[in-house]
Amino acid sequence: SFLSNVRFSKNGKYISYTKTKANLEKNDYEHYVYVYDTQSKENKEYTSLGKEKNIVWLDDTRLLFQTSRDSNIKEKKKEGEEWTEYYSIDVRGGEAKAFLQLPYSVTDIQACSSGFVFTANYSNADISLHGLTGEERAKAIEKKKEEADYEVLDEIPFWSNGLGFTNKQRNRLYRYETASQKIEALTPEFMNVEYFKVSENRVLFIAEEYHDKLEQTNALYEYDLLENRCSCLIEDGNYNFSFADYMGRDIVCAASDMKSFGINENHKLYFVKNGTLELFYENDTWLLSTVGSDCKFGGGKTFHTTDNALYFLSTLEDFSVINCLHRDGRLELLTARDGSVDFFDIYKDTLVYGAMKDYGLQELYLKENTEEIEITKHNRTVFEEYSVSKPEKIFMESYGESIEIYVIKPVGFEEGKEYPAILDIHGGPKTVYGNVFYHEMQVWANLGYFVFFTNPHGSDGRGNRFMDIRGKYGSIDYEDLMKATDIVLESYPIDRKRVGVTGGSYGGFMTNWIIGHTDRFACAVSQRSISNWISKFGTTDIGYYFNADQNQSTPWNKVEKLWSHSPLKYANQVKTPTLFIHSEEDYRCWLAEGLQMFTALKYHGVEARLCMFRGENHELSRSGKPKHRVRRLEEITNWFERYLKKQERE
């Protein structure tokens, strides 16, 4: 079970959350609303259709959730209309009731004093069917069908991973008045809202308005719902904001000017004072959890404010925690320095959070003062039914840094016996591996493999300077990975001729890079990879700014540098049999990246295979259709079995 979106009720008596489960037969995911009673300690499922999520508390006992139940709306959606349905339920008893129907594809919703504020997808190019009837509606539907054959692009990015083509689409801010049932747009047609937070009659939001090219800076706004007035607090052009909220009478925010370490620079915390930013805390951590796992689905709150404190997630070394930053500047760590805290909520002095602790799967934990209890047991039976090999931790030195290396032994490990091994490389590169459960790694450990992984330079958790490998891809990070491999092979009974390598996204880039620079690995699996920084620049949703920033070059000012950091340049040196895993709708690292490397290997006579997944994107391994996730893991595992256990079969 995957847990997400934990929320206290208004009076703190109840805690709601979403439980998501994969349904292999339906090849989809089911979402259920659960509520925990903090007084009776009872944990109860409140919905049963498997379509309920995105919970908002209306008051002390009633909650609102998104679902899909109305047959008329389903028919309208088939014709091309956008609708989002909300139902309410009283946790003291009774059936769920239809509460709100919005003629938009809602992306987030929050309650305000007079109704709701929400964001929704808005298209400046699409044909709207809302309000049309009779012949006029029929003609519009026919026109939409005709236009479905075409995509007109006149801005960048023109598509987005997980969303498809997004040309002229924006995430727009709206207000819904309960009394009048009136919906009003609060932002212009071409403004894209990235974040908003409601506090009674005021709304803070982060947005940027653009027409041809989306830049990486944005602006901070405040909307007064009583006076219907929008004020720009900090203008666009200087900062990238990621969060803002009210802290008593003050406004606190997280932002970076990106001048020292580029687009991945850690955001500092500021107060907004008279149109300027006043430093609150000199932060040098990423303000969320970047601890990876293939057993997370959905998210939740990562910031919370009171009159005198700011609570936030951050990634430290190889774990993530909840911090409390007091108004006087004192920083207090609220959770253990291990595992991954993924989301949380706070009511007065009580903290509830979702985490992967003690190498387990996600559960919810309740902490009041110093006392902490686990309030869910959704995933405990997994460890009673299956064998799990927990990682050991060893260390290496690299340019003055002590870097952890995790090693998972094969299940049923026997002294005196040599085993095959797999080096697994994380994506990002600004993420981390930690002492956190990975399903794929345990599958391999159960099949008799050592699995090892590390956090090379470029990873998160150690500050900006460690993270910053701009212009250095394939150098210092490659050195770290090869050194980690050397140390693991020296420390464990591994057959050096039966070691494989795999990774996804940046990890796929490194896999491609590795096979072009060494033949030490018996086989490789390159997933959702990068092979050519030049082609990625012009074909992906982030390429035009991410490539320029991370490589310190563009195809027009330093094309030789882009090419020198491209694994494709070295494909003529590859001898390693390589499997490529790529999704057809991966617009983060487009299919062309895998195809180019695959073609190059085939051209040069190297054994290669590519498995493409239709209808999937960059998130295949984490949230792809269940059957596709199974097939992906089968493809990878079969490749390792073929090349790393060949000697055993012989």
Tell where the protein language model's regions lie, with residue ranges.
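Cap/lid segment of the alpha/beta-hydrolase catalytic domain
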Residues: 378-491, 495-497, 504, 538-539
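Active-site-proximal cap/loop segments of hydrolase catalytic domains
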Residues: 456-650
